[in-house]
Every structure is written in C-alpha cells, then in structure tokens.
C-alpha cells in the first residue's frame, strides 16, 4: 500500500508467479499428469526481471517482465505441446508466438495509480536473480491453488 496504491493480489491469495497458459475451463485431473511429468524433467530455472510494464487494457495492470531465455521459452513451448496433444488450447495471448511472460504485481488499479505503481517497481530491488522452482495449476478469481510440483533435474539411472 505504498503511496496509497493498493493491489488486491495479496488479499485474494495470489503469490508471485508467471502464467504460462490460461484457460477458460480445464479439468484439473486431465492436466495433472502432464504437469507432474514436465516438472520431473526440468531443473529450476534461473530468472532475472529486466523490465516493468503495463498492458493496454481497461483495468490497470502492472507487471515485471523476466529476461526471456531459451529455457523459459522451452518450458512454455513444451507445456503447450503437451496440452495441445490433449486437445486443450490455451487462451490465444498465452500461446507460443503471442505470449508476453510477466509477473503481475498489481491489478485493477485506477488509471491514475498506474504510473506511480510503475515508478515504485522501477525503483525497487526486484531486478535481481531468482529461481522458477515449481509448476502448478491455479484457479483464478478467486485464487485457489489446485496443485503444484517442484521442478527438479531428471536423474538418469546408472
């Protein structure tokens, strides 16, 4: 609530994340094996936030953008390939070639709070390194975590 700017994210139970696919509806039981298998094949991904931005939408959204790496794009592409094979197609702006990776830090801001929120982010210490450590399914509005799986390296049997 710095400088009078409030985002409902903490109140609705949201935590920092990067959405790699969004659906109007999806059966959690159908997606679970794919996410679990994908998580078992991936090491945690190092990420660095490189920019702060906003979407050209009616509701005020402020986000951090990670530096796009081959590993992040591979995770995104791999998940979509798995879900496409099940006949599950994500919303178009989350599809490969259209996706803008981002970590939302504020939503539903009044127009006059967007610029101050961008400035707060720009001057903060959020631009260091971090790790993408898990993949999961979350219901949104209201936020309800369904399940998540830690990313870990695939260990070959010797």
For the regions a language model picked out, list residue spans one by one.
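Hydrophobic, well-structured mid-protein blocks that either form specific transmembrane helices
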Residues: 37-67
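Short proline/glycine- and acidic-rich turn/helix-capping motifs at secondary-structure junctions
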Residues: 50-59, 96-98, 134-144
